[in-house]
């Protein structure tokens, strides 16, 4: 597998995606768990076509910073880029906006 593989996952923030509904906060903004799931989805899909049959990816470490909240109705995109390959360990840079 080579560096540079990318994928963008897209989600429209709806009620079920909010911090209030997911129990991770008390506001109707995109929940952190939803954002992280979208980011993991982008990483998984970036490399899925290149994995051996029957293989998948699992998250091992996530380091994220929030810049602004995403209100209901806003479309959020998470773009993952494979930036490092060390044996079976894959490292991604992922931006959600």
Region annotations inferred by a language model:
Residues 1-30:
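Catalytic strand-loop segment that frames the active site of acyl-thioester-processing enzymes
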Residues 3-5, 58, 74, 88:
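Residue-level preference for beta-strand/loop junctions
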Residues 6-10, 61, 93:
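Well-ordered beta-strand positions in beta-sheet-rich domains
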Residues 30-34, 61:
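Residues at secondary-structure transition points
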Residues 37-41, 45:
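Short, residue-level hotspots on alpha-helical faces of the histone-fold
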Residues 44-77:
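Hydrophobic beta-strand-centered segment that forms part of the acyl-chain substrate-binding groove
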């Amino acid at each position: 597998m080579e560096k540079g593989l990318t994928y963008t996952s897209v989600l429209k923030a709806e009620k079920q995606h909010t911090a209030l509904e997911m129990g991770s906060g008390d506001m109707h903004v995109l929940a952190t768990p939803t954002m992280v799931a979208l980011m993991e989805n982008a990483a998984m899909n970036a490399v899925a076509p290149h994995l051996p049959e029957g293989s998948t990816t699992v998250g091992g470490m996530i380091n994220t910073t929030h810049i602004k909240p995403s209100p209901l109705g806003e479309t959020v995109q998470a773009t993952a880029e494979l930036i490092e390959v060390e044996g079976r360990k894959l490292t991604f840079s992922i931006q959600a906006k």
